[in-house]
Curated annotation (Swiss-Prot):
Protein name listed in UniProt: Krueppel-like factor 7
Example of a GO biological process term: negative regulation of transcription by RNA polymerase II
Motif (Nuclear localization signal): 214-219
Functional summary from the UniProt entry: Transcriptional factor. Plays a critical role in neuronal morphogenesis. Represses the corneal epithelium differentiation. Acts also as a metabolic regulator, by modulating insulin sensitivity in pancreatic beta cells and skeletal muscle cells. Inhibits transcriptional inducers of adipogenesis and has a repressive role in the expression of several adipokines, including leptin.
């Protein structure tokens, strides 16, 4: 055994004299000394081998010249498509950028080439949002006017050579070919509003050219209210919600109910007469209110 001696010869003789025998098994101190010796040998040799091999690999990596195909790919690529200039890459010999020219070009073309499926999905989402807004808002609501105003989005490539302009206006679509790519886009009118304008600017500035915006001039004048209506009668009915005026009185004998809108009076008057003009198409049931008929129609779906 390669064990460091922890006792002298005199200590061993004294141990034999006192106990009558000498144990051949190593003690805890001898085991600890052996472990320290093995660790010291390991730490002196093993890291030196790793450092030598790592240094050799590092020297080969730093001093290796880049392949000529990579240099040609850097020269042929547009400098705007690369985050660093090709001249800097040539000067710094310590940096070896391993890029595949075909892979880089294919990824660049894929990122710059809009597919027809993505454009169709974009148009379908806008159409679905427009249908949801029109079905949930009354015809004179200002939220509907915001979504009916044409919204445009410009998709430009990195180098600025190919520009696709998408204008969604009520679902009138046509096919436009730009750079050999067929894209579904809307027809832009002659007086189209620029895409940089906001919704309020489009509603106000485009009122001269778009006939629909000319109608939306009836705005509520009360503080904090931004309601916009296409008809003056709708605006007057809305303003009565601020003033509390109820000019429509029920003419039924003994009824003192008053209403701010004429349709509310008509709906109330059916309670006296018992009229039910709204009939279900699937059954024989009739209703006095259209919203009650709509709730009933959901049962047949």
């Amino acid at each position: 055994m390669d064990v460091l001696a922890s006792y002298s010869i005199f200590q061993e003789l004294q141990l034999v004299h006192d106990t009558g025998y000498f144990s051949a098994l190593p003690s805890l101190e001898e085991t600890w000394q052996q472990t320290c010796l093995e660790l010291e040998r390991y730490l002196q040799t093993e890291p030196r081998r790793i450092s030598e091999t790592f240094g050799e690999d590092l020297d080969c990596f730093l001093h290796a010249s880049p392949p000529p195909c990579i240099e040609e790919s850097f020269r042929r690529l547009d400098p705007l498509l690369l985050p660093v200039e090709a001249t800097i890459c040539e000067k710094s010999s310590a940096v070896d950028i391993l890029l595949s020219r075909d892979k880089l070009l294919s990824e660049t073309c894929l990122s710059l080439q809009p597919t027809s499926s993505s454009l169709d999905s974009y148009t379908a989402v806008n159409q679905a949002q427009l249908n949801a807004v029109t079905s949930l808002t009354p015809p004179s609501s200002p939220e509907l006017s915001r979504h009916l105003v044409k919204t445009s989005q410009t998709l430009s490539a990195v180098d600025g050579t190919v520009t696709l302009k998408l204008v969604a206006k009520k679902a009138s679509l046509s096919s436009v070919k730009v750079g050999g790519v067929a894209a579904a886009a809307a027809v832009t009118p002659a007086g189209a509003v620029k895409s940089g304008q906001s919704d309020s600017e489009q509603g106000g500035g485009g009122a001269d050219t778009c006939p629909e915006n000319k109608k939306r001039v009836h705005r509520c004048q009360f503080n904090g209210c931004r309601k916009v209506y296409t008809k003056s009668s709708h605006l007057k009915a809305h303003q009565r919600t601020h003033t509390g005026e109820k000019p429509y009185k029920c003419s039924w004998e003994g009824c003192e109910w008053r209403f701010a809108r004429s349709d509310e009076l008509t709906r109330h008057y059916r309670k006296h007469t018992g009229a039910k003009p709204f009939k279900c198409n699937h059954c024989d049931r009739c209703f006095s209110r259209s919203d009650h008929l709509a709730l009933h129609m959901k049962r047949h779906i």
